[in-house]
């Protein structure tokens, strides 16, 4: 009995350990994507970044589909839902790429952590889910955290902060429509339509002014990194959630904040305010409180 308590069964410990490794992969992918996005922003606007990123992603997805023999999974009857999901995601990702060029990377990541709170608020409207008392408490705590991170005064509030806060709403819409799609669609199908639709959106938006900039030889590796990291990050998160409960996975995802703060300091000389960490801890606490409440009910 004592040995079992001190040494958890291998079949329980190994999946949790694997989930942790996947989440470290997600942290690394998101961090590299932020650095790569800032590097190419000196040459390309956000629409061009999204267009080239989607082309890279489409090549990777098609290679995966062909190698795995999953072409039969691509036909869909949910084109409208795919379209809505990708409008939200394209908007949110554009705002995210814009924000990382305007404000410290750690501040962008802290505000992005409010995505689950927006899911909590929008789900009753889009999915018909019930707004419980615990969800209301979590939302209030989260938005107090937003105020601490953003400190909205005439001196501190700017378009970069607004973009970072708004991108979370776009990502929330993405998750809500993804939740609908996963009931009937495979991951390969969802990723295929994501890359195709966003490549089209990017091409239309980037070419609206009649001038699409081409990446230089120096920027091309960064664009490839953005395209690959965007896919690997979401693959790692999905894999981690399939191996361990969200209440265990979520705290590891929070490691993105100190990691990106260190990267921002070392690479770009960005000093991070203590308010970013205080607010982010409150945002994380609100997210975790909601996760814990939902897990306990289930």
Predicted regions located by residue number:
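C-terminal-most transmembrane helix of multi-pass membrane proteins
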Residues: 3-4, 258-298
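Hydrophobic/small/kink-forming positions within alpha-helical transmembrane segments
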Residues: 27-35, 62, 86-94, 116-121, ...
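Structural signature of hydrophobic alpha-helical transmembrane segments
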Residues: 45-59, 97-115, 157-170, 216-230, ...
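Hydrophobic transmembrane alpha-helices of multi-pass small-molecule transport proteins
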Residues: 134-150, 167, 275-291
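Membrane-interface interhelical linkers
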Residues: 1-25, 58-84, 133, 196-224, ...
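Transmembrane alpha-helical segments that form core, pore/gating elements
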Residues: 35-38, 46-47, 61, 154-215, ...
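C-terminal transmembrane-helix exit sites in multi-pass transporters
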Residues: 98, 115-137, 258-277
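Helix-helix packing/entry segments at the starts of transmembrane helices
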Residues: 108-114, 181-196, 234-265
